[in-house]
Amino acid sequence: MTTWFNPSIQMQFRVIDGLSVRFAQSGDRGDHALLLSPWPESLLAFEPMWARLAEHTHLVAVDLPGFGHSQRRDALMSPRAMGEFVIQVADAFGLESPHIVAPDVGTAAALFAAASHPGRLRSLVVGSGGTAVPLQLGSLLRDWVENPDLDSFRRADPRRIVASSLTGIERYELPDSVREDYLSSYEGDRFVESMRYVRTYPAELPILRDLLPQVQTPVQIIAGRQDRAVPPVNGEFLHQRLPHSKLDIIDAGHFTWEDGADDYASLVMTWWSGAYAAIAAAAPL
């Protein structure tokens, strides 16, 4: 067990479906939420709002396989396969009808999970992840998705690539210990292998697009107005197709959960306290 600089976050490992998965959880509460790590970060991305979200909800945050410090399995490196693993994680922790918080790469996985398992998840909070068809991504992320020469990334210094990506955090002062956790998460071949997930977007996002109108799970979408990596049009794309959704565009860049942590946490807490149920009961958009 590793206790971070925030003593309320105690990181541990659990074997789920044969994989070593890093997780942290808060104290027990009546409601449950599963938080999925963004990329190229780790579950520590939720540290700025952990205490607030944990006040009334039992939190389980995980590094998805191949991300953060969790073990990778090549067969899971796509949103659709990862969505099935998300359900396995919920089962492993005994989370009945949990809320899901899934920014960035977790967005498509959570939506696939909701589409494939109606009624299993209470609600989703998503955003800042590629979902639009055709792709609507900033030039750097688009290159990671579409560049045919994966070996060029394999030859590059992964710590430098991740450090460059983290310059997109503009307001939040990232603690050195958290920065090192992010950098060490993708050392060796871990960054280039994690790219395989987003490189399935051209094949998998059209499948997800066709499933969105069938998703009955209520979805809160949070996007950053100044997001240059995954422009807000991705959130608008979801909102137009999901029958029970709410879209909020906040004053932040890509890393809304860190740069806009206060606004993000407020939206999530309002959502969990009853807004999700109102959206679920409302007539489809």
Language-model features, listed with the residues they occupy:
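Conserved HGGG/HGGXW glycine-rich cap/lid loop of the alpha/beta-hydrolase fold
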Residues: 19-69
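Catalytic active-site module of serine/aspartate enzymes centered on a nucleophile-bearing elbow/loop
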Residues: 244-285
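Flexible "cap/lid" loop of the alpha/beta hydrolase fold
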Residues: 115, 121-153
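Conserved serine/cysteine hydrolase catalytic core
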Residues: 190-240, 251
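Gly/Ala-rich beta-loop-alpha elbow adjacent to hydrolase catalytic centers
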Residues: 102, 106, 110
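Conserved alpha/beta-hydrolase catalytic His-Asp/Glu region
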Residues: 135-137, 155-214
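N-terminal cap/lid segment of alpha/beta-hydrolase-fold proteins
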Residues: 2-20
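Active-site loop/oxyanion-hole signature of alpha/beta-hydrolase fold enzymes
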Residues: 16, 24, 61-102, 266
